[in-house]
């Protein structure tokens, strides 16, 4: 079995009872380890992750999570970590601490006879997005893409890594908290098949003959399972702090979406 999950946002100042949140995530991974061959984490497992040039004591809060990931590694379960927009600032530390394989870009894999496109989902837009959206939405997208470019700038990353961890973390965690509270106060539900950026992106890829059987994304914090073509489906994974949704691919190439409820799973109810 191959499992897919995303968006735990560990360490978030907007999530109450952080230790209970981390414990439930560990329970979820333990459940997966019973039959997992590999596990794909599609980004934003941390609300803020930065690897500084000096030791960062704040990362001790994630010790139980790291311990569980090392246990998975010892069992021979491969854990692949695709970075998102909250945790892209890893420079070898996660591989060393947690024994995961980090990937910084979307990837296409073939498993059990099926081709899968995996990505966190931030920054993926159809080519003609400027024609599709009204000015207010276009402006919002441009602002996000500018911010994304800043976050990925190697020189600016270097400067931030030079900060004392207590300074960098104070800013980073509070910025992430502000983002999370804004999302809670003004949630952005499923926009519909003709407006949801990731749906349009996946459909465009199919039109360009870049066929995949499954597209799997995180980022949007909505649970979506959509048939975009007769032989192609896309899934947005939801999250691992409120919805607790994940997907799994069995040895026959069947992809299903489930909800974790503290030791057991059930079929997820999807956005329409």
At which residue positions do the language-model features occur?
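A structural signal for the main folded, soluble domain(s) of proteins
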Residues: 1, 9-12, 31, 261-266, ...
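Active-site-proximal beta-strand elements of phosphoester/diester hydrolases
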Residues: 1-9, 115-122, 232-238
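Structural motif
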Residues: 4, 40-41, 118, 216
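Core catalytic region of metal-dependent phosphoesterases/phosphodiesterases
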Residues: 5, 10-111
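Histidine-centered divalent metal-coordination motifs
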Residues: 9, 85-86, 120, 218-221
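Short, well-ordered, mixed-charge alpha-helical segments that flank or form enzyme active sites
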Residues: 88-92, 118-119, 125-128
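Conserved beta-sheet core of the metallophosphoesterase superfamily
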Residues: 97, 101-105, 122, 127-140, ...
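Active-site-proximal loop/helix segment associated with metal-binding centers of metalloenzymes
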Residues: 121-200
